[in-house]
From Swiss-Prot:
Organism taxonomic ancestry: Viruses, Varidnaviria, Bamfordvirae, Preplasmiviricota, Tectiliviricetes
Protein location: Virion; Host nucleus
Protein name: Hexon protein
Chief location of this protein within or outside the cell: virion
One Pfam entry name: Adeno_hexon
Positions carrying N-acetylalanine: A2
Organism: Human adenovirus C serotype 2
Amino acid sequence: MATPSMMPQWSYMHISGQDASEYLSPGLVQFARATETYFSLNNKFRNPTVAPTHDVTTDRSQRLTLRFIPVDREDTAYSYKARFTLAVGDNRVLDMASTYFDIRGVLDRGPTFKPYSGTAYNALAPKGAPNSCEWEQTEDSGRAVAEDEEEEDEDEEEEEEEQNARDQATKKTHVYAQAPLSGETITKSGLQIGSDNAETQAKPVYADPSYQPEPQIGESQWNEADANAAGGRVLKKTTPMKPCYGSYARPTNPFGGQSVLVPDEKGVPLPKVDLQFFSNTTSLNDRQGNATKPKVVLYSEDVNMETPDTHLSYKPGKGDENSKAMLGQQSMPNRPNYIAFRDNFIGLMYYNSTGNMGVLAGQASQLNAVVDLQDRNTELSYQLLLDSIGDRTRYFSMWNQAVDSYDPDVRIIENHGTEDELPNYCFPLGGIGVTDTYQAIKANGNGSGDNGDTTWTKDETFATRNEIGVGNNFAMEINLNANLWRNFLYSNIALYLPDKLKYNPTNVEISDNPNTYDYMNKRVVAPGLVDCYINLGARWSLDYMDNVNPFNHHRNAGLRYRSMLLGNGRYVPFHIQVPQKFFAIKNLLLLPGSYTYEWNFRKDVNMVLQSSLGNDLRVDGASIKFDSICLYATFFPMAHNTASTLEAMLRNDTNDQSFNDYLSAANMLYPIPANATNVPISIPSRNWAAFRGWAFTRLKTKETPSLGSGYDPYYTYSGSIPYLDGTFYLNHTFKKVAITFDSSVSWPGNDRLLTPNEFEIKRSVDGEGYNVAQCNMTKDWFLVQMLANYNIGYQGFYIPESYKDRMYSFFRNFQPMSRQVVDDTKYKEYQQVGILHQHNNSGFVGYLAPTMREGQAYPANVPYPLIGKTAVDSITQKKFLCDRTLWRIPFSSNFMSMGALTDLGQNLLYANSAHALDMTFEVDPMDEPTLLYVLFEVFDVVRVHQPHRGVIETVYLRTPFSAGNATT
């Protein structure tokens, strides 16, 4: 095969787009046209469905798909390596574009997997309502109450002393319970719930203590008479107190009973249920003359109490011992955490990693066609390729294609208030509510009664007790719309605020590792930070949320779909199909011969799996195990003579297969320390011929794994990985880009509004009116992005065509916004009131926490009115967001004349031989380390030559970064 140095000089095309993805020789194009009824030489997903109808002599030729079993496996703690021998027979052509790895294994998504919001257990219960329960308390109740109040302030030593004093005192059991089931009578055998009339003498039937009375059965209508005998179940003092919301105890018998089984004398496990009898209080007994008779029986039991999907958001004391104060615990649902394989199985196969790449080698030559380059953008390139050939919003389950997304109403809040003109009422079940008892009377005598001298007497035709309510129906009001909107804001925005704005709930145990689910789940935030009155009437994203990854969210529809594909349980036996993405071999036509094909598959759960919270799945107990990895491959269904003709043509080096990487770029990551604002870059001197431009964005260090190692021990995150999947969201943090070549030529020039050697992205102060679209992006930058993405060099009423305006493009993701805020310099009455002292809806909401409402109804002191006759002085704030896309600066001979030209009309950068490059990026400071991700757009081409059976040779050409690295 000819080496690049022996080949004629390539003629470079300077293009601004990424459309030139594959080049075929004229001979191969002619052949493809002649045989287009048999197969299609398109992109990744060719469709080999038309089998030939003649010249087929063997059964094997009709078998389109074959399964290859690995000849060697290597299963380690961090990876699984599979090696295959591909035998391509005579008159066959194997289509590498159709190959996929068929993988079976077992996935443990860990105890932090929760594929829903809210709770599955008693979701309708109030958050602070206890179960029917019991606790012990000292006989001196006054002292006990005082102890409860002081409990929070005591340290451990005082608690131990207090405990000893309590042990010496007399303890009594207290009960807080409900007895919903009415019975006929109560005896020492319990509650009689019926009679067995089968025998001559009716035999009473008592509740079966193992499961009766059942908690779900009680009075079936609102006006049932008061029960003389009632029963219910109650949890013993030895069962830990938990709020009813979220509490669960597994059944221990087929009837649904939940009592803990205790072995009897013979070792047979039986439910341990004790009957507790209760009468009216003494004063009532004396008044009614009832002596002491049971009115209520409670069936007390211990159960296996669990809270599978909730946790405590408020706890009165540090201890877990049952007490009266513990009745006031508040429960809160665990945060949803979807866990699934990444979009297109990103991260599952090793790419871009030194020493861990795959192998495709002919067994006759053993030359590997896969060349190690640490900055191949294989995963990102594949994402952008798919976007260019199809609609990424349509999911394709076979390849796990469901693109990461976010709810735009969560990223940018359009707070237009709540439509709550009419009040919403709720009424008592009987409609009337509180009634008084009346006696019917009638007029006595024949007088008219107009003078008020009528006498009245009891009306014996009516009952003695008649229930009558006076006035309007009893009702309670709730603002449903405002509550729903407030809950949306808290669940979707407040809980995702940066951790520095959150705090630990009092007395609640919490992990000290901020990467764990336990820590993320239990931290709470004051609802007032994101309430329904914040930025009311504006379309604005919370400034705190702009730099938070919006794709790490339970409303990431793509991740939710991929999670549901696996099911809704923690343990999943999975069976998946994974395509090859490496550009040099994903579209290859493999000619007859025997080949070795080998690849590595990661087992690092943080890389392979994606979670909506981004917690450290390694620490939180997730794991993945591969049981088998097979390879499925498809042969072109061609007649033998057609296949042999194609083989003969492809063996000729003039018909080598050439493939361009879709992204065709060398990437570099430059660290940006926390709070830094300037990032300088230097590129050594080189010839810039064939250079297409720059694309850049910003990544968080925490969210970017080290691809050079198979297992990065410092990678403690499992959310979206912008570096690989294109979920960029920090584009708005760039201010300026300065570009300086070491020549006297200024680039860009001073055309239009462009400042020489500089691109200004946004302006906070815009005295000259350079900004555009009512935000702080400059007109220059808007123009450059429209040119780079759509070749639109002028404005007017012209927006890009839909086929150009794809998911990752600029125009679709550009979101300008503005709002007004109080001008604290002009408005002299302004007071900077801290959140601790702000009140709005006081008395109707919890104080600084998602807990029980407290306070009183009172005029609000926040926010200042920006409308109406009393509107205060205000200033306008402007900004924009532009997620998913890469900022692009084209560098091409047909992209505007952005520099001085020679007499021949040629830019000096092309005329001169080599230049060094200095770039300086000015960015907004962020309080954590980040990375500047720069793609140097080049021509990244591979030529594949198969001169003989079992021989495959490749030449990779990347100009002007020949070795694949921007520093070489």
